[in-house]
């Protein structure tokens, strides 16, 4: 198993280097939240680009203090250059103007603010924006369109969350980050498990079977329950996948009009 993950690390580092070169970039930038996914991406980027891999820390007015602490600790441990841009003043303005905004609206606004800061830094420093969303999030649509899902390339987008955990172990990610509950940190008390209803240890095996069995076919509830999955779990996951499938699609462009 260790040998497989060492090969994966080499593969992902090679991906980052080649894809950046292909696009004409020598520097990269990514958002570092203090969570697992961005920590893994940060360490991979540091291995490839050294001082040319830059992390942006972008806490909001509701970010947990330990998120910033964990991000700073990672930067110190792995010698990662970083800049902090607080988005708190901006999300406070949004909250004051839209007092009835739901937590989801506020969270999406913060995610898109961070995207704006990343792409502004990208332009200023001639750096390529690196994504940090894992495959579980992408399949479930558990992310903000044109927010945390926005990037130029993504080294972990084909790794399920449970696989990211395993990779993080071999990258020597600090235990504090490894052991804390996954959270987008978009509002107080948020956690992935609360939002999704299940831990990734339960969700990922189902997602893998869905991918293996229904790549080009409609997903069938009965097939999955016959494999032993709980019916409510399967219904919830299928509903989320179908509802959010558009987030993985490129914008649909009308075909060129040719008058007869």
UniProtKB/Swiss-Prot annotation:
Its EC number is 6.3.1.5. One of its GO terms (biological process) is NAD biosynthetic process. Belongs to the NAD synthetase family. It catalyses: deamido-NAD(+) + NH4(+) + ATP = AMP + diphosphate + NAD(+) + H(+). The keyword Nucleotide-binding applies. GO terms for cellular component: cytoplasm. Homodimer. One of its GO terms (molecular function) is ATP binding. Pathway: Cofactor biosynthesis; NAD(+) biosynthesis; NAD(+) from deamido-NAD(+) (ammonia route): step 1/1. PANTHER family: GLUTAMINE-DEPENDENT NAD(+) SYNTHETASE, NH 3 /GLUTAMINE-DEPENDENT NAD + SYNTHETASE. This is NH(3)-dependent NAD(+) synthetase. InterPro entries: NAD/GMP_synthase, NAD_synthase, NH(3)-dep_NAD(+)_synth, Rossmann-like_a/b/a_fold. Catalyzes the ATP-dependent amidation of deamido-NAD to form NAD. Uses ammonia as a nitrogen source. Mg(2+) binds at residues 37, 137. It comes from Helicobacter pylori (strain G27). Deamido-NAD(+) binds at residue 112. Keywords: ATP-binding, Ligase, Magnesium, Metal-binding, NAD, Nucleotide-binding. ATP binds at residues 31-38, 132, 161, 183. It comes from the Bacteria.
